[in-house]
Swiss-Prot record:
This is Inositol 2-dehydrogenase. GO terms for biological process: inositol catabolic process. The lineage of its organism: Bacteria, Bacillati, Actinomycetota, Actinomycetes, Micrococcales. InterPro entries: Gfo-Idh-MocA_inositol_DH (IPR050424), Gfo/Idh/MocA-like_OxRdtase_N (IPR000683), GFO_IDH_MocA-like_dom (IPR055170), MI/DCI_dehydrogenase (IPR023794), NAD(P)-bd_dom_sf (IPR036291). Its EC number is 1.1.1.18. It catalyses: myo-inositol + NAD(+) = scyllo-inosose + NADH + H(+). Involved in the oxidation of myo-inositol (MI) to 2-keto-myo-inositol (2KMI or 2-inosose). The gene is iolG. It comes from the Bacteria. Keywords: NAD, Oxidoreductase. Belongs to the Gfo/Idh/MocA family. Pfam families: GFO_IDH_MocA (PF01408), GFO_IDH_MocA_C3 (PF22725). One of its GO terms (molecular function) is nucleotide binding. It comes from Leifsonia xyli subsp. xyli (strain CTCB07). The keyword Oxidoreductase applies.
């Protein structure tokens, strides 16, 4: 439990996601302050230092040596997560780690082994959809059984465009990664297999990408999930889910922006970025984490074990981009530490 009036949070990574979290903790979150910004790029660190009273460091080790933080948000690119998680756990810091936990399951297992040397889980994963009001309402419907048993889920995940650095495998590891967490959470069952189908290619997509793709996810309880992953749709950012039950259906993620009638046309404003579509979910996620750290429970959402399961699903999904048929996999036995 923190002994200071406000939890002193360090933010690792000052790119788009890190800068968003810095602003969020500074302007929205109660009970916490940004005390350290860990970013090797001096320009980014300076730009992100808008948080009053924060200090910039080139590495987490430097911030730890200066006793500049009590908890850390990791928002670096995924390939660097293990490099930050190891010293954070060694110092006993509570961690909110943006997805993914690590790029592959072998790294994830190493992180799990290190975390289990502590007295309890210290890592919360940044799968913010679990904190979205609509996703929570849908999960409550599934759990209640009011519409009968859940039979299958249908998802769409659409981006207007992606940066030049976005590669084919990132359709899975940077985008569908969210479905690999939230769909099992909704259905109450882990992923058993992943298959990728290719519809007609969008010739307006970047030359390096073959998309959209249709991802078929089978869960261990028999629920089937299909996800349209489309990153060149142009019109906006859209994430939606339909659930089919024994006695009805339910939908979330429908457009809810400005409704306009003009020139004999009707339109509804749509989001253009995940930062606005899930702004409230991000706020709720970070606030829940801060509250958990302050009360000593440390984790108030998906944990490192959930991150390991998602890493396995991503590995299967990347294989499925080039291999036919469902790619099945089985996780290691779940340690009692994560019960």
């Amino acid at each position: 439990m923190t002994t200071t009036p406000d939890l002193r949070v360090g933010v690792g990574g000052a790119g788009q996601m890190g800068a968003d979290h810095i602003q969020r903790i500074t302007r929205v979150i109660s009970g916490a302050t940004v005390s350290a910004i860990v970013e090797p790029d001096a320009g980014r660190a300076a730009a992100a230092a808008a948080a009053p009273g924060s200090r910039a460091f080139a590495s987490l080790d430097d911030a730890l040596d200066a006793s500049a933080l009590e908890a850390v948000v990791i928002a670096t690119p995924g390939q660097f997560h293990e490099l930050v998680l190891v010293p954070a756990l060694a110092a006993g810091l509570p961690v909110l780690c943006e997805k993914p936990l690590t790029p592959d399951s072998a790294e994830a297992l190493r992180v799990l082994e290190l975390e289990q040397t502590l007295d309890r889980p210290h890592i919360q994963l940044g799968f913010m959809r679990r904190f979205d009001d609509e996703y929570r309402a849908l999960r409550e419907l599934v759990v209640s059984g009011d519409a009968g048993e859940l039979l299958f889920l249908r998802g769409v995940h659409r981006n207007p465009s992606v940066p030049e650095s976005y590669t084919q495998s990132m359709l899975i590891t940077d985008s569908v990664v969210h479905e690999f967490d939230v769909m099992p959470w909704l259905a109450g069952s882990p992923v058993a297999s992943v298959e990728v189908k290719y519809p007609r290619r969008n010739d307006r997509a970047p030359e390096r990408l073959r998309e959209p793709i249709l991802v078929l996810i089978e869960l261990r309880n028999g629920v089937l999930v299909d996800v349209e992953m489309n990153v060149s749709v142009r019109f906006g950012y859209q994430v939606a889910t339909e659930a089919v039950f024994q006695t009805g259906t339910a939908r979330i993620g429908q457009p809810a922006g400005l409704q306009r009638w003009s020139d004999a046309r009707f339109s509804i404003a749509e989001h253009t970025s995940f930062t606005t579509r899930f702004a409230r979910a991000y706020d709720a996620q970070v606030q829940a984490w801060v509250d958990a750290v302050r009360d000593g429970s440390l984790v108030a959402g998906p944990n490192a074990w959930d991150g390991y399961l998602v890493a396995l699903a991503c590995e299967a999904g990347v294989r499925a981009l080039s291999e036919p048929g469902p790619i099945a996999f089985a996780p290691a036995e779940r340690p009692a530490f994560y019960a």
